[in-house]
Regions:
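Non-catalytic, mostly N-terminal accessory regions of nucleic-acid modification and defense proteins
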Residues: 1-223, 283-289, 396-399, 428-429, ...
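Short secondary-structure junction motifs
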Residues: 29, 250-252, 279-281, 360, ...
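Conserved nucleotide-binding/hydrolysis micro-motifs of P-loop NTPases
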Residues: 41, 262-263, 290-291, 315-318, ...
Length: 859
């Protein structure tokens, strides 16, 4: 049967769908506190019961039996049992306040909302006596169960909270945490709520792709045993850094953070704990970072704690940040000899982080571009930082990455151990993104390009530059990126002579370096010289075909196909063999690097495009599939199925029902395509016939609605009507049938009504055939899962994972060539109309108008 595991994508979808269904009209930022808070309480309850199970070695008991046993043990050995649970967990929850007891009360029809309030209050009381109560204190302070946003009366609020409680009821939070699925789901929900919250999201969330840039910058710079985020938000930056460390480093990592907003501070602690961070490994404080310098070294109270990594996405250009009247006597600012202006707190956050950075550490902070060029006190601070050799890199990111602001931002990287004379890496990544709805997003390839450029310190035209101290001094310590990296010029200037007399200027062919290097002779053969130095393309279509079939392209295409086949063969065997011991993150990283190397020897292709193809394969298929395979084995997982649940009805009749089964790994339509092709072809043929008939019927409906048409008088009365007697876009079959019976064959209208009747009848019959054949094919597919051979599984899974990869990567080879051919076509069109031809056209039009005027007769 195999082990049915809930995958990361499945739990994310389930929880987010549930959130949207349950929250009603409550705004995202409000509902987030309730959903994430109760989800965390379920985690605490599951951990409590899991500790009881481990302590008593009750591994075979169901959850209900375990709850009953816990109640008995707790009542019998109360103080002793509290100690047994609290010691390893840092807290305890009495049985009457467990999440499982809430569900029991719900199922038995005696749930009251007060039990949730009592449970949360009891948790606060019990942890107050802990040695380190800060770990859990006031975690649920944002959950106001009397808030009328939950419902205007107690019954409505109780009903809404019960629905939310039920959403998490069957999730084993302990098992999900061990596989990181729980933490990932929690982080996903935070991100989704952030997008829904819009501007308010800036208080607690850094977009995942921005977190990745900062995390990979610091993680690739050296060993990390401690990490600090002075504007910690939800804690996502700390956790993203963790994911890029070795397993051993993750276990030993110490987390530090400070957050001013209390609700967000609670979110941080929950997020860290759900990601498996032990309470003793995290120190998070609810306070104003700039007003209250923290943390201090407890053994040396007058010295700052320093960390291996500092990451931060602080509020941008925070006004009036210095309400406490801080001065240069504050050691965070004294070493640069200038106070950041009260009107913008950007450098205040930067200097705070730098003050707490260890001598061998790396800091990465997200800031608005103004810090790179603004003058006054900020200019003095920037000069001091450059002279002291602290700034290691400046990375310009695209605009509109954040939900709370559209301004472009940059990442400033700082170190205290840079070599003397080492240049500053300046990267302009502002043009590398993909637009998703209204937001811009960095893709995997964009992040990889940034990190490789930074770590390898590569200079790339229009992308990166290594700026020396002398060069920066010549620019008056201005680090504005366009001073060092010239933007890509895509616009080709217009040539006056070309417009006047026609022809593409010879120098414009220098802007087509790819086709002029790989197919220069082919291009020249398709050009005719209009006059000296100006050309036109004879036939752009045949030129494109010949260039794409040129010997160079064909050779590279064949070589690339061989590379792809080798790549696929290698990873096909690796992916089939994953197990619970496989580190999927490491496997993904190696596979992506190998994909990038596919184009290493082809100079005109961006090798990161192949990187993205494989990254999308992981996002869309491999991540989920490999989680399932790792819990079973390849061939066992491949024949596993699950109920296909669909929502039917609406309103009070809305319900969820099973509609057959679907494969856990192998999609049903793949089995149809490869193993039941005849049946599928038959269905496709039916569908094509149906589409044709419905098009024909649609044309009749249109003329039946048109009062001026010949068919109106015959067909209009046969259309369906709504309650207001307005015609619908459909015929009433009963009316058509009745009309046909009343007409005789000699009537003028008979053929038209008969045609309508025949169309409706044929559509009805084809729909029945489709329904019957669809049901029959579905049943064959359901049964076929159990009898799939290893060879069939190999065929199906290979096509799922790699069926389109040769074509997808092959397109990358041709894309730059096609782009230049499009430019050539545009240039040919641009200079096709000369001044002489335009004058001639005007003259001809004037003559035509003159002739028409002569024919006008005044009556």
């Amino acid at each position: 049967m195999g082990i049915h595991v809930i995958t990361s994508d499945e739990i994310k979808k389930r929880l987010w769908d549930g959130a949207n269904e349950l929250r009603g009209s409550m705004n995202a930022s409000q509902y987030m506190d309730y959903m994430l808070g109760l989800m965390f309480y379920k985690f605490l309850s599951d951990k409590t019961l899991d500790q009881v199970r481990a302590t008593e070695m009750l591994h075979d008991l169901t959850e209900a039996e375990l709850l009953e046993r816990y109640e008995k043990l707790y009542n019998e050995y109360q103080e002793k049992y509290i100690k047994l649970i609290r010691q390893p967990l840092g807290y305890y929850i009495p049985p009457e306040y467990l999440y499982q007891r809430w569900m029991k009360d719900i199922n038995e029809g005696r749930f009251e909302l007060q039990i949730v309030t009592d449970s949360l209050n009891n948790f606060e009381r019990t942890i107050a006596s802990n040695q380190n109560p800060d770990d859990f204190e006031n975690l649920f302070s944002s959950l106001d169960l009397t808030n009328q946003a939950l419902g205007k009366d107690l019954n409505t609020r109780s009903k809404n909270i019960k629905s939310l409680i039920a959403l998490f009821a069957d999730l084993n939070m302990v098992a999900l945490q061990k596989s990181d699925i729980l933490g990932d789901a929690y982080e996903y929900l935070i991100g989704m709520f952030a997008m829904e919250s819009g501007k308010k999201a800036g208080e607690f969330y850094t977009p995942r792709q921005v977190s990745e840039v900062l995390a990979q910058v610091v993680a690739t710079s050296g060993p990390i045993a401690s990490i600090y985020d002075p504007a910690v938000g939800s804690g996502s930056l700390l956790l993203t850094v963790k994911q890029h460390l070795s397993q051993q480093a993750q276990k030993e990592l110490m987390y530090y953070g400070q957050e001013k907003n209390t609700a967000t501070y609670n979110l941080t602690r929950m997020n860290l704990l759900l990601h498996g961070v032990r309470p003793e490994k995290m120190t998070v404080r609810n306070a104003d970072t700039l007003a209250q310098d923290w943390p201090e070294d407890p053994e040396r109270p007058n010295e700052a704690c320093q960390f291996d990594a500092v990451v931060m996405n602080p509020p941008y250009s925070l006004k009036n940040w210095n309400s406490e009247g801080l001065t240069l006597s504050d050691p965070r600012f004294s070493f640069v000899g200038a106070m950041p202006p009260d009107s913008a707190g950007d450098y205040a956050f930067l200097l705070h982080g730098l003050y707490h950075l260890g001598q061998q550490g790396t800091m990465a902070i997200v800031l608005p571009h103004g810090v790179l060029f603004r003058g006054g006190a900020e200019g003095a601070i920037r000069k001091r930082l450059i002279d002291k050799n602290y700034i290691d890199a400046v990375i310009g990111l695209p605009s509109n990455l954040f939900t709370n602001t559209g301004i472009p931002v940059c990442v400033v990287v700082l170190k205290k151990n840079r070599s003397l004379g080492e240049p500053i890496v300046i990267i302009d990544a502002s043009q590398y993104f993909v637009k998703v709805k209204t937001q811009n997003m960095l893709q995997d390839k964009d992040i990889a390009r940034i990190i490789e450029t930074y770590t390898s310190r590569i200079e790339t035209e229009s992308y990166s530059h290594l700026a020396s101290l002398g060069e920066i001094k010549r620019n008056d310590y201005n680090l504005n990126i366009p001073r060092y990296v010239e933007p890509i010029k895509t616009e080709i200037p217009h040539h006056v002579d070309g417009h006047l007399y026609g022809g593409i200027p010879k120098e414009d062919f220098n802007r087509l370096p790819i086709i002029m290097s790989i197919a220069q002779d082919i291009v020249k053969n398709h050009l005719s010289e209009v006059r000296e130095g100006f050309y036109k393309v004879k036939a752009i279509g045949s030129l494109q075909a010949e260039v794409l079939q040129s010997p160079t392209i064909e050779t590279e295409r064949k070589t690339l196909e061989d590379y792809i086949n080798t790549f696929v063969e290698k990873y096909w065997n690796i992916l089939k063999s994953v197990s619970s011991e496989t580190n999927l993150a490491d496997l993904k990283a190696v596979m992506l690097d190998d994909a990038k190397n596919l184009f290493a020897d082809i100079p005109w292709v961006d090798s990161y495009e192949a990187y993205q193809v494989v990254a999308e394969l992981w996002h869309q298929k491999l991540t989920t599939d490999l989680e399932i395979i790792a819990a079973n084995d390849f061939y066992t997982a491949a024949i596993m199925t699950e109920p296909h649940m669909v929502t039917k009805g609406s309103g009070k009749t809305k319900r969820v029902e099973q509609d057959g089964v679907i494969g856990r790994l192998i999609p049903n339509d793949l089995i149809e395509h490869f193993l039941f092709s005849e049946e599928r072809d038959k269905l496709d043929s039916y569908q094509a016939d149906l589409d044709s008939l419905e098009t024909e019927l649609g044309e009749l409906i249109e003329v039946a609605k048109e009062e001026t048409s010949d068919e109106y008088n015959t067909l209009n009365d046969l259309l369906k009507r709504d309650d207001n007697d307005e015609v619908k876009d459909a015929f009433d079959a009963a009316h058509v049938n009745k009309a046909l019976k009343e007409l005789v064959k000699t009537d003028e209208s008979f053929e038209l009504v008969k045609k309508t009747y025949d169309l409706l009848d044929r559509i009805k019959k084809i729909n029945k055939s489709i329904k019957d054949d669809r049901k029959s094919l579905d049943e064959k597919v359901y049964a076929r899962f159990e009898t799939l051979t290893h060879e069939e599984i190999d065929q199906l899974m290979w096509n799922k994972w790699f069926g389109t990869i040769t074509n997808d990567i092959g397109k990358i080879l041709e894309a730059p060539v096609l782009k230049e051919l499009d430019i050539l076509s545009m240039l040919n069109e641009r200079y096709s109309d000369t001044l002489q031809s335009i004058d001639l056209e005007i003259s001809n039009l004037e003559k035509s108008l003159e002739e028409m005027m002569k024919e006008l007769v005044l009556e």
